[in-house]
C-alpha cells in the first residue's frame, strides 16, 4: 500500500510555529495548489491543503517561508480526530510533510516583500547564513552579491553586441 503526497504551491499565510510539551517544534501551514483544469468561466481553481512538519524542518519552514512563498512538499496524508469544546467530534485531514523544498531564491519571495529572511546573507543557500558557505573555498557567494544580485550569470547571454566567430573556430 502506498500513501504518498507531492505538492507544489504557495503559502496562504505565514507558517505557525509552536512547541510540544516535550520541546519538539511543529509548524503548520496551508498551501494553495492550482488545479490542472479550469472551471466553466475559464478560471483556474485552487485547493487549500493543510500541512504539518516537525522538529528542525519545522523551524526552517517558520524561519524561511512566509505568505506567498513557493514551496514543494513531499509527505503522506494523515487523518486525526478530536473532541471540540462543544463536545463534537472533529475530523482533520492534513499532509505530514516529510520534506519541504523552498522553490524560490531567498530574495525572490512570492509576496513581493523581499525574501525569506532579510538578515541572512548566505547567497543562494537556504540554511547557510554565513559569509563563506562554499565548502570548496573561494568567495563566489560574495562575488555574486557584489554584482547587484544579478540572476543572469550566463556568460553566453545576449548583451546586444554581435558575436565575432570565424568558421575556423567552430568544431563542425
UniProtKB/Swiss-Prot annotation:
UniProt PTM: Phosphorylated by YwqD, which increases ssDNA affinity; dephosphorylated by YwqE.
Domain annotation SSB: ranges: 1-104
Cellular localisation: Cytoplasm, Nucleoid
Gly residues composition-biased segments: 107-131
Phosphotyrosine sites (modified residues): 82
Keywords: Cytoplasm, DNA damage, DNA recombination, DNA repair, DNA replication, DNA-binding, Phosphoprotein
GO biological process: DNA recombination; DNA repair; DNA replication
Keyword check for Chloroplast: no
One GO CC annotation: nucleoid
Induction: Strongly expressed during exponential growth, decreases 2-4-fold in stationary phase, part of the rpsF-ssbA-rpsR and the ychF-rpsF-ssbA-rpsR operons. The operon is induced by DNA damage by mitomycin C.
Subunit structure, interactors included: Homotetramer. Interacts with proteins involved in DNA metabolism such as PriA, RecQ, RecG, RecS, DnaE, RarA, RecJ, RecO, SbcC, RecD2 (formerly YrrC), XseA and Ung. Interacts with RecQ via its 10 C-terminal residues. Interacts with RecD2.
Function of the molecule: Plays an important role in DNA replication, recombination and repair. Binds to single-stranded (ss)DNA and to an array of partner proteins to recruit them to their sites of action during DNA metabolism. Associates with oriC, this requires DnaA. SsbA binding to ssDNA prevents DnaB and DnaD individually from binding to DNA. Has a 20-fold higher affinity for ssDNA than SsbB; SsbA and DprA activate the homologous DNA strand exchange function of RecA-ATP. Enhances the activity of 3'-5' DNA helicase RecQ.
Domain statement: The C-terminus is required for interaction with a number of interacting proteins. The C-terminus acts as a hub to recruit proteins to active chromosomal forks.
Protein name per UniProt: Single-stranded DNA-binding protein A
Amino acid at each position: 500500500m502506498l500513501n504518498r503526497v507531492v505538492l507544489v504551491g504557495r503559502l496562504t499565510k505565514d507558517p505557525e510555529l509552536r512547541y510540544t510539551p516535550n520541546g519538539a517544534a511543529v509548524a503548520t501551514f496551508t498551501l494553495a495548489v492550482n488545479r490542472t483544469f479550469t472551471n466553466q468561466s475559464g478560471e483556474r481553481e485552487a485547493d487549500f491543503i493543510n500541512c504539518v512538519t516537525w522538529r528542525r524542518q519545522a523551524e526552517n519552514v517558520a524561519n524561511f517561508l512566509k505568505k506567498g512563498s513557493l514551496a514543494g512538499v513531499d509527505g503522506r496524508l494523515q487523518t486525526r480526530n478530536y473532541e471540540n469544546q462543544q463536545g463534537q467530534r472533529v475530523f482533520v485531514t492534513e499532509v505530514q510533510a516529510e520534506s519541504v523544498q523552498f522553490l524560490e531564491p531567498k530574495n525572490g519571495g512570492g509576496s513581493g516583500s523581499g525574501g525569506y529572511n532579510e538578515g541572512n546573507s548566505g547567497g543562494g543557500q537556504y540554511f547557510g547564513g554565513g559569509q563563506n558557505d562554499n565548502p570548496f573555498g573561494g568567495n563566489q557567494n560574495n562575488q555574486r552579491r557584489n554584482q547587484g544580485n544579478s540572476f543572469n550569470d550566463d556568460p553566453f547571454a545576449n548583451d546586444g553586441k554581435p558575436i565575432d566567430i570565424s568558421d575556423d573556430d567552430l568544431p563542425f
